[in-house]
């Protein structure tokens, strides 16, 4: 079964089993609602041997989520999971509108310019503010390129071919 990362359990909060979660999903209100089942994995790369938990309480504060899981009602029950990755099964993903993508669909794609010049590979996605930023790892030790996900820059995403076509704005490359 395939799992996809939606957060990281970064710390405990208080003594009643509440945990602090850094969110890496565009749908936190859906992923972290009461009754939702999640899987906890020791490392981000693990796909088997996860622990299934069910959310008993959830609240959002300053971009973080504070969760309590059913049956884990004190700090001793949850402390061992600090640093663990929170994932959902592939079946929990829903279809997105045209032009929208899950992170796992974008990371790893090759990037070429509109002049068909290879630029590199998307290695991660940042969400600093109004627009996501796609980080492109370049070949031969060149510095990474930060591409804002705006229509003026991202011209085409072809998931089948594994290629993103971009138009470089002045100043995007050193």
Curated annotation (Swiss-Prot):
Give me the Gene Ontology terms describing cellular component.
cytoplasm; ribosome
List the InterPro entries.
PRC-brl_dom, PRC_barrel-like_sf, RimM, RimM_N, RimM_N_sf, Transl_B-barrel_sf
Question: Does the record's keyword annotation contain Chaperone?
Answer: yes
UniProt cross-references to Gene3D superfamilies, sorted A to Z: PRC-barrel domain (2.30.30.240), RimM (2.40.30.60)
Q: Which GO terms describe its molecular function?
A: ribosome binding
According to its UniProt record, where is this protein located?
Answer: Cytoplasm
Q: Which family does it belong to?
A: Belongs to the RimM family.
Q: What does this protein do?
A: An accessory protein needed during the final step in the assembly of 30S ribosomal subunit, possibly for assembly of the head region. Essential for efficient processing of 16S rRNA. May be needed both before and after RbfA during the maturation of 16S rRNA. It has affinity for free ribosomal 30S subunits but not for 70S ribosomes.
Note the PANTHER family from the entry.
Answer: RIBOSOME MATURATION FACTOR RIMM
The protein's name is: Ribosome maturation factor RimM
Organism lineage reads as: Bacteria, Bacillati, Bacillota, Bacilli, Lactobacillales
Gene that this polypeptide is encoded by: rimM
């Amino acid at each position: 079964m395939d799992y996809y990362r939606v957060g990281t359990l970064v710390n405990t909060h208080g003594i009643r089993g509440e945990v602090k979660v850094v969110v890496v999903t565009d749908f936190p209100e859906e992923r972290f609602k009461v009754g939702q089942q999640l899987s906890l994995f020791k490392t981000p790369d693990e796909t088997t041997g996860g622990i299934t938990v069910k959310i008993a309480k959830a609240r959002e504060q300053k971009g973080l989520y504070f969760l309590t899981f059913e049956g884990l009602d004190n700090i001793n029950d949850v402390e061992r999971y600090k640093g663990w990755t929170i994932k959902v099964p592939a079946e929990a993903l829903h279809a997105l509108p045209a032009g929208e993508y899950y992170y796992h669909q974008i990371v790893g794609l090759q990037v070429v310019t509109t002049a068909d010049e290879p630029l590199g590979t998307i290695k991660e996605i940042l969400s600093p503010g109004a627009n996501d930023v796609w980080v492109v790892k370049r070949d031969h030790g060149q510095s990474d390129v930060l591409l804002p996900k705006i229509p003026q820059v991202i011209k085409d995403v072809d998931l089948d071919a594994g290629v993103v076509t971009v138009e470089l704005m002045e100043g995007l490359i050193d």
